Amino acid sequence: MKKDLKLCESDYRFMCVIWENEPLPSGKLVELCKEALDWKKPTTYTVLRRLCERGIFQKEGGTVRSLISREEFYARQSEMFVEETFHGSLPAFLTAFGSRKKLSDTEIDELQKVIDAMRR
């Protein structure tokens, strides 16, 4: 998959339609996109083709399925954000995030558990 995963909101909504219904026939995808996004068939196929070219989905034998899970996509998006915005420094990200939003004790405990698990 290409590194560039920057997407517009409509692409993301389209991806959610697929993730929530996969694997699905491309004709069913057109129906779902008409209902959920008010898209016409050509729009659905154009966006699908573009996201297939980016290695996120595949259309094989008329069936559409993801090549990466929603969780993997989120992980890659988060990693790219930290890399581009904070030069890859997770501590810098957490410092910036924590300075604007007060973390609850529960959130701090959860973060500490993640850090402790990474040390093992």
What are these model-derived regions, one by one?
Residues P23-C33:
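Short acidic, hydrophobic short linear motifs in intrinsically disordered regions
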Residues C52-G62:
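A short, conserved structural fragment
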Residues I18-E22:
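Short helix-to-turn junction characteristic of helix-turn-helix DNA-binding domains
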Residues D4-S10, G62-M80:
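Short, cationic-aromatic polyanion-contact patches
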Residues R76-R120:
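Amphipathic alpha-helical dimerization/coiled-coil segments
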Residues Y12-V17:
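Pre-recognition alpha-helix immediately N-terminal to the DNA-recognition helix
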Residues Y45-R49:
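Short, hydrophobic-biased segments on the C-terminal half of alpha helices
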